[in-house]
C-alpha cells in the first residue's frame, strides 16, 4: 500500500513516488480510479505512468496483465493532466531507448528512429551520415566511430515556434555501445554499456516533449551517435584528431570517447548562437564515486548550473552542483 500523508505535509515528489508505488503494486485489478480534485495532478499522473513502466519489447513470454488508472479531477485540470501525460510519456521514450540492446540500436537505426519520432512531433530533422561527417570536418565523431562496422551519424532536431524569444541548444552523448575501443574496458559489466547513449535519449525526449507541449522557446538538439569498437581502423592512443571548427586534440585513452564526440557536437551547436547550451552525458564513473548512482553532477556557469540543479530536484531528478575549475 502507498503511504498517506496530510495534505499540508505532501510535496510533489512524495505524491509522485506514492503514485509510482501504487502503479507497481496494484497488478491484480483491471481498473482503478483516483479522485484528486485540483490537487497533485501533475505528480500523480507522472508517478502512475513512470512507476508502471516496464521494458517488454523483447520478452518472449506473453505480456503481463495491465491495470487502467482513471484520474478524477476538476474539469479545469484537463490541460495540466495532458501536459503531465506528455512529459511522462516522453520520459518513456528515453527509457525504451536506453533499454534497447546494441545489436538493434546502433547509429543508423537510432537515427532512423529519432527521425520518425521527431517528424511525428513536428520537428525539423537533419541527419549526417559518415560521408557528410567526413566532408564537414566532424573529426571527433569519425575518430570514435571508425573502429566499428556500423558508421556514425549526427542527428539534429529543431523546434522553431513562431515568436520564440529564446533559443536553447541541447547536446547529448549517443555512444550506442562502448567497449572502450583500443583502450579496452574490463569485461565485467560491459553489458551495461548499451546505456552509454542515455544523454542523447534524454535530449531527444526533451525536445519531442517540447514540441508536443507547443513550448514557445526555440530548441535545437545536436546528437552525435557512434559505436566505440576496437576494429582494424580504430583510433589509437596517441593519435591526433581535428575537431569540427579546427581545434585538434591528442587521444591518450580511447575510452574517453565521449569528450571527442561532444567536442564536435558542442562546436556545431554553438554556431546557432543559443541563449543557453545544456549538455548531458554518461561521461565517467568517477561521478558515481562522488555522488552515487542516482544523483547527477551539474557543472557550468555558476548561476545557470545552480538553477539547473534546483530544477532537477524540483521534478524528482536528483542533481547536485559540482565545481568546474580551470587550472
Task: For the regions a language model picked out, list residue spans one by one.
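A generic structural signal for tightly packed, nonpolar segments enriched in small/aliphatic residues
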Residues: 111-327
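Short amphipathic alpha-helical segment within the helicase RecA-like ATPase core
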Residues: 2-174
Amino acid at each position: 500500500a502507498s503511504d498517506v500523508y496530510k495534505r499540508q505535509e505532501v510535496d510533489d515528489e512524495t505524491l509522485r513516488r506514492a503514485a509510482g508505488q501504487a502503479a507497481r503494486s496494484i497488478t491484480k485489478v483491471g481498473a482503478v480510479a483516483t479522485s484528486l480534485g485540483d490537487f497533485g495532478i501533475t505528480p500523480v499522473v507522472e508517478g502512475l505512468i513512470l512507476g508502471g513502466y516496464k521494458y517488454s519489447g523483447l520478452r518472449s513470454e506473453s505480456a503481463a496483465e495491465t491495470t487502467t488508472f482513471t484520474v478524477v479531477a476538476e474539469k479545469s485540470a484537463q490541460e495540466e493532466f495532458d501536459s503531465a501525460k506528455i512529459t511522462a510519456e516522453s520520459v518513456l521514450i528515453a527509457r525504451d531507448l536506453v533499454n534497447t540492446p546494441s545489436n538493434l540500436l546502433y547509429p543508423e537505426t537510432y537515427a532512423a528512429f529519432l527521425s520518425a519520432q521527431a517528424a511525428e512531433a513536428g520537428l525539423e530533422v537533419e541527419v549526417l551520415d559518415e560521408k557528410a561527417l567526413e566532408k564537414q570536418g566532424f573529426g571527433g565523431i569519425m575518430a570514435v566511430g571508425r573502429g566499428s562496422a556500423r558508421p556514425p551519424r549526427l542527428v539534429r532536431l529543431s523546434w522553431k515556434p513562431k515568436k520564440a524569444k529564446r533559443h536553447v541548444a541541447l547536446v547529448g552523448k549517443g555512444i550506442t555501445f562502448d567497449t572502450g575501443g583500443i583502450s579496452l574496458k574490463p569485461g565485467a559489466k560491459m553489458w551495461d554499456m548499451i546505456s552509454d547513449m542515455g544523454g542523447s535519449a534524454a535530449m531527444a525526449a526533451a525536445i519531442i516533449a517540447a514540441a508536443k507541449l507547443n513550448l514557445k522557446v526555440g530548441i535545437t538538439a545536436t546528437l552525435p551517435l557512434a559505436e566505440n569498437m576496437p576494429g582494424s581502423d580504430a583510433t589509437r592512443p596517441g593519435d591526433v584528431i581535428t575537431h569540427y571548427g579546427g581545434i585538434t586534440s591528442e587521444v591518450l585513452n580511447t575510452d574517453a570517447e565521449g569528450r571527442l564526440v561532444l567536442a564536435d557536437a558542442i562546436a556545431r551547436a554553438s554556431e546557432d548562437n543559443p541563449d543557453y547550451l545544456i549538455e548531458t552525458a554518461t561521461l565517467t564513473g568517477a561521478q558515481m564515486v562522488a555522488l552515487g548512482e542516482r544523483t547527477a553532477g551539474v557543472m557550468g556557469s555558476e548561476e545557470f548550473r545552480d538553477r539547473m540543479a534546483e530544477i532537477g530536484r524540483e521534478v524528482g531528478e536528483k542533481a547536485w552542483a559540482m565545481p568546474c575549475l580551470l587550472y
